[in-house]
């Protein structure tokens, strides 16, 4: 198991806090707000945020989440079931 350095742990916690506080304001259709979400730090350098059971997502919502994250990141959307998708944000921790 890799020990996550304190600055990266703090940055990941700050991102998680910003998302939990701000997602309701930028997601009026509740496509992400209230959905199951997981946070995972990979190799101590990358934060992966995965939203499951999302009925769909618009580009404006993705951009809003990226603004909340406040760090360089990218997003992927992948089919989960016939009706839902997985929305994954990958953030570089510095």
Residue ranges and their predicted role:
Residues 44-80:
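Short, hydrophobic/π-rich interface segment
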Residues 78-94:
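C-terminal edge-of-domain segments
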């Amino acid at each position: 198991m890799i020990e996550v350095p304190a600055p990266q742990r703090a940055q990941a916690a700050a991102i998680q806090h910003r998302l939990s506080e701000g997602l309701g304001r930028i997601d009026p259709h509740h496509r992400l707000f209230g959905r199951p979400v997981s946070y995972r730090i990979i190799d101590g350098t990358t934060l992966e945020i995965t939203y499951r059971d999302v009925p769909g997502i618009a580009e404006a919502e993705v951009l809003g989440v990226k603004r909340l994250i406040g760090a360089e990141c990218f997003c992927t959307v992948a089919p989960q079931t016939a009706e839902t998708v997985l929305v994954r944000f990958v953030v570089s921790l510095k």
